[in-house]
Amino acid sequence: MIYHQFPCRLKKVSLSTVKRKDLFMKTLYVSDLDGTLLRKNETLSPYTIKTINALTSSGMLFSYATARSLNTAKKVTEGLNTHFPLIIYNGAFVKDNITEEILIANYFEEDVYEVLKDLFAHEIYPIIYSYQNDIEKFSYIPAKATSGMLAFLNSRKGDKRTNIVTTESELMYGNLFYITCIDKPEKLQPFYHKYKNK
């Protein structure tokens, strides 16, 4: 929900009160997607689309920040007129919503390879997102994929970013920016506590 400098929640906004183009020019409103703008079925309600589009047409600055990629974020926000840059992959990138140009990039530093080697040593093989020759990819080793990973990957069938690999070195190739581990909680929790502040 949007609360900042606004007298009420988004769903209670009266569109008739939004008249001046400069009404919202000093505040950028940024919302999460999952669990906030999106419904449980990962869609926007017609009311949300209508309200946000009316507000942005009246001059409100609006964007969203999400753990999703630009690809999946755009699918679930179809119909939303958001022309402001978007924060994706939990802040790994800020991208232009129109041209999809990377405006800000936060790649992992070299010490990520030590973390990955630690995971591999404990039979945890994540899905790794990277840029390879200026092309966004997500790489994984099918033979090492958990049932949870396979379910996740199944929801991404046909995604042009898919990069199936067979070795650890191939999995770590490119400019890495996002790692997704999907396994049993008892297997992942020790690593969460070990690396959460790094």
Task: Locate the predicted segments by residue.
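Polybasic, lysine-rich low-complexity intrinsically disordered segments
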Residues: 11-12
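Short, basic/glycine-rich phosphate-binding loops at helix/coil junctions
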Residues: 31, 93-96, 170-172
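Conserved acidic, metal-coordinating active-site core of Asp-based
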Residues: 122-124, 129-198
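Active-site phosphate-binding/coordination module
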Residues: 44-150
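Asp-based phosphoryl-transfer active-site loop
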Residues: 27-40
